[in-house]
């Protein structure tokens, strides 16, 4: 998701997105640990998406 799309969302929507991404990250980590994860790049993508959401939340908190 692009940063511009994230900035258009409300804080509640961003928190929901963050919870969703955290759950997805957990599932991917478990798949990687058991050797079932074929597309390992997904871990990096989810980690970066979490960072983007947290950054936008911090920006909104400063406003």
From Swiss-Prot:
Q: Which Pfam families match?
A: Ribosomal_L29 (PF00831)
Q: Which GO terms describe its biological process?
A: translation
Q: Which CDD domains match?
A: Ribosomal_L29_HIP (cd00427)
User: Could you say which residues form the signal peptide?
Assistant: none
One GO CC annotation: cytosolic large ribosomal subunit
- Keyword Phosphoprotein listed: no
Q: Name one GO molecular function term.
A: structural constituent of ribosome
Which PANTHER family does the protein's record reference?
A: 60S RIBOSOMAL PROTEIN L35/50S RIBOSOMAL PROTEIN L29, LARGE RIBOSOMAL SUBUNIT PROTEIN UL29C
Q: What is this protein called?
A: Large ribosomal subunit protein uL29
Top-down, what is the taxonomic lineage of the species of origin?
Bacteria, Pseudomonadati, Pseudomonadota, Gammaproteobacteria, Pasteurellales
Query: What gene does the UniProt entry assign to this protein?
Result: rpmC
